[in-house]
Structure formats: C-alpha cells, structure tokens
C-alpha cells in the first residue's frame, strides 16, 4: 500500500535548484494551537511519508521549539531515512530574549543550531528567514545564511513572505559577494489569497526562477467545507483557538462578505460533487495545478485529512479549462495586474498561463 501511494506522488524542482520536493508537504504549525495533539500529528506525518511526501516543514516559533521536537521524534519513531527527507526550518523568533529574535548573524546561526538540536539532526535541507527584518543590514543577513551552508548546517536557504524587491536586493548582494542565493519563498496561496503567487512574485519567478513553498492552501480550513453555512463548528480550528479565529475568520469571513462567501462555497461544493471529490480536495488541487507552486504545505490532525489531501492529486489530473473558468467566476478575486507601459494596458493575468492541464500524478515536473 505504501509503495503504491508513493508512486502517485508528484515531485517538482524547488526553484532554480536540483532539489526535488513532493508537491505536497506537511508542516508543524498546528503545535501553536493544539499542543495536546502531538501523537496525532506524528501519525499524520507518517501517513504523509508513506504517501510519498518528502518535505517536512517546521519553525523555531512553532510551539517555541515543540514543532521541531515533534518532527524530530517522528523521524526517530518511524525510522525514516534521512536522505529521503527534505527538512525545512524557519528562523526569526524563539523567545522574548533580545538576542533570540530577528535576522542578526547571531540569531540566524544560533537559532538554526538550536532547531537542529531540537530535531536531533546534524543539518537541515532548507533554512528560511521566516520574516523580513528591516532593522538588520541585509548584507549581514545574507552572509549569515550563506555561512550556514558553507559550514554544513543547511543545504539551501530561502525566504518567507519577503517582498519581491527585498528578494531581488538579497540576490544582488549574493551575486556581488559570491554568496549562496536564496531559492524560494514561503508565501500564502489559496483561493482566497492570490496576490503573492499570481501577481507580486511575477518578476521574481521570471528573473530568478524562484520557487515557492506555499502555505494555508485551505485558508486555515475555511475552504474545507466545514464553514459553508457561515458558522464556526466547535471542533474546527477557529472553534478551538481564539488566536486562530482572529487570524483567519475576521479577515476572510467578515460580516461584509460572509454572504458572498457562502454563495461561493456553495458553488465550489457543486463542482466538487461533480468531480466526486471533497471541497477540500478541490481547493488543494486548485493550488497544485499552478506550476508556480513548487510544494504546498498542509496541516493535519487526522490521518483521514492526509488521505484526502493526497487524493487532491487525482483531482488535479482531471483539471480542465472549463473547471478553471467556473472556479474563477465563482471566486471573483483575480488579482488586479500592474500596467504594462509599452501597451498602457494591464499585464495579462499570470495564472491562466501557469495552470497545468496535463497534470500526471507520480511524475517529476520540470
């Protein structure tokens, strides 16, 4: 069963590198909200591994180190081969102490070492700047990440929610000084949040072949089908965590747009039913058919959720221009593109040129 599942996983190169990552990844962010569900998460992580997921994402701030430890325990418990894994850690903040925060050389290096200690590993494959830091000189930051690679603590470095101009500045400094360049950004991408991938990073993709490790493909569960009636289920993430509710519900399901959202959810459910899939599987497939997405990070607290996410690969194989158009008409949120000053007309929308209508599960996509 495990080998059959693995054969269905699709892999893509991460940005302008030779690193192959599964198009689906699992992360530890839920430890911020559900610390009691550690065992359940570990079982989910193993189910993901058995399904061919090779990318596992964590951060020093997730549970203030608990996310790292949970992933490390999973590697030991299930005997995963280290050279089969792509482990990513994110550095930005680990405690209130003044030296435990932001993108100084000191914290980047010491924070990475602490994450590796919590993971029980000698190195990570990817180390991320979890957020941009405008107070620390950019050269100091990029030198520190390059140092980690030179000294064997990481194989590549990446950014997370960095603005495109800052990414270009960082790459320019690296090229000038002969340092290792970042290869991907971890940004949000889902049906309700499209601007980063479909507009803002357009030139970054073209100029630098930058990759993405996108997060929140189901918009924190809002696209899962649980919220279709406009109410918050008690057993949902928003129902269990006020912090999570404040982060996701307010901005995306406010009183001024909730009726519009309910109508949209109803339309998505109709399409999902026609494709014999769940609404969550449809939403995830919508993300991964975009070739600008290198890998898509999901969270899970139940094995059934992992199984459903993997089934999104089958939904992606069924993708057609008609499905794409119907969904886009429901969403009504295609990013407003910048003006192309040779024509004084907006740039063409990017997503239509990047959707893969020949998605085949189990292949390596260029």
Where are these regions (language model features)?
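N-terminal binding-site loop/beta-alpha segment at the start of enzyme catalytic domains
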Residues: 1-86, 122, 150
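Terminal-tail/helix-coil boundary detector
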Residues: 2-9, 207-208, 231-274, 289-293, ...
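Glycine/proline-rich, positively charged
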Residues: 35, 50, 94-196, 200
């Amino acid at each position: 069963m495990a080998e059959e599942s693995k054969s269905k996983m699709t892999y893509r190169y991460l940005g302008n590198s030779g690193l192959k990552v599964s198009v689906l990844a699992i992360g530890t962010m839920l430890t911020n909200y559900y610390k009691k569900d550690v065992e359940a998460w570990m079982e989910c992580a193993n189910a993901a591994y058995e399904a061919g997921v090779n990318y596992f994402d964590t951060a020093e701030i997730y549970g203030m180190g608990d996310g790292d430890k949970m992933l490390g325990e999973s590697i030991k418990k299930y005997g995963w081969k280290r050279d089969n894994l792509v482990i990513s850690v994110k550095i930005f903040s680990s405690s209130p102490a003044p030296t435990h925060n932001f993108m100084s050389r000191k914290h980047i290096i010491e924070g990475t070492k602490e994450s590796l200690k919590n993971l029980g590993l000698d190195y990570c494959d990817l180390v991320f700047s979890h957020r941009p830091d405008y107070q620390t000189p950019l050269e100091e930051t990029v030198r520190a990440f390059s140092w980690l690679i030179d000294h064997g603590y990481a194989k590549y470095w990446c950014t997370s929610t960095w603005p495109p101009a800052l990414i270009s500045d960082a790459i320019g400094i690296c090229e000038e000084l002969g340092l290792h360049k970042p290869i991907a950004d971890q940004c949000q991408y889902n049906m309700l949040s499209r601007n980063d991938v479909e507009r803002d990073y357009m030139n970054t993709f073209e100029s630098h072949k930058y990759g993405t490790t996108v997060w929140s493909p189901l918009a924190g569960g809002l696209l899962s089908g649980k919220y279709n009636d406009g109410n918050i289920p008690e057993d949902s993430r928003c129902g269990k965590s006020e912090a999570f509710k404040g982060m996701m519900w307010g901005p995306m399901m406010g009183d001024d747009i909730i009726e519009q959202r309910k109508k949209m959810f109803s339309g998505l459910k109709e399409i999902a039913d026609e494709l014999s899939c769940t609404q969550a599987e449809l939403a995830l497939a919508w993300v991964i058919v975009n070739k600008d997405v290198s890998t898509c990070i999901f969270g899970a607290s139940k094995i059934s959720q992992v199984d459903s996410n993997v089934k999104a690969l089958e939904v992606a194989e069924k993708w057609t221009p008609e499905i794409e158009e119907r969904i886009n008409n429901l969403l009504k949120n295609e990013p407003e593109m910048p003006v192309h000053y040779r024509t004084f007309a907006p740039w063409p929308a990017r997503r239509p040129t990047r959707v893969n209508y020949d998605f085949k599960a189990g292949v390596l996509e260029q």
